[in-house]
Regions:
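Short, cysteine-centered beta-strand-loop-beta hairpins and adjacent loop/turn segments enriched
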Residues: 56, 84-93
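Short, surface-exposed coil-to-beta transition loops
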Residues: 60-63, 78-80, 93-98
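A solvent-exposed, acidic/Ser-Thr-rich amphipathic alpha-helical stretch
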Residues: 4-9, 20-70
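A short hydrophobic beta-strand element
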Residues: 72-83
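Beta-strand residues in well-ordered beta-sheet regions across diverse protein folds
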Residues: 34, 78-80, 112
Length: 112
């Protein structure tokens, strides 16, 4: 299977995950996300946020993968998700565009 296909599967896996169990096994130890607020957060921090009672994920759907570029053991992808979630009881419907970096470690592509 090509690296592009493997990264597409990671994107689809994240989009279709119904809980936070997808992220930790599919991310590097040094994974870092930067939220729209500008605050960085680790994979563990994201899992804790999604497992809190304040945040309730209702649905997530991959709308489009815009681009995947691979440079050796590093890649990036840009994709859009249609997400519905509630935060502290307030429902949000977001069309969110993500830019993600991936690393190829020990024969496996992971979110970085």
């Amino acid at each position: 299977m090509t690296s592009t296909k493997l990264i597409e599967y990671l994107i689809e896996g994240y989009a279709n995950s119904e809980d936070s169990s997808f992220l930790i096994p599919n991310s590097t130890k040094d994974f870092l996300a930067v939220r729209p607020s500008g605050n960085p957060i680790s994979a563990k921090g994201l899992v804790e946020m999604f497992n809190s009672k304040d945040l309730v994920a209702e649905s997530s759907e991959l709308v489009k993968t815009h681009k995947i570029e691979i440079f050796g053991d590093i890649a990036y992808a840009v994709f859009t998700l249609n997400e519905i979630f509630s935060y502290k009881g307030n429902q949000n419907k977001d069309l969110s565009t993500y830019t993600c970096i991936f690393k190829h470690e020990n024969g496996t592509w992971k979110y970085s």
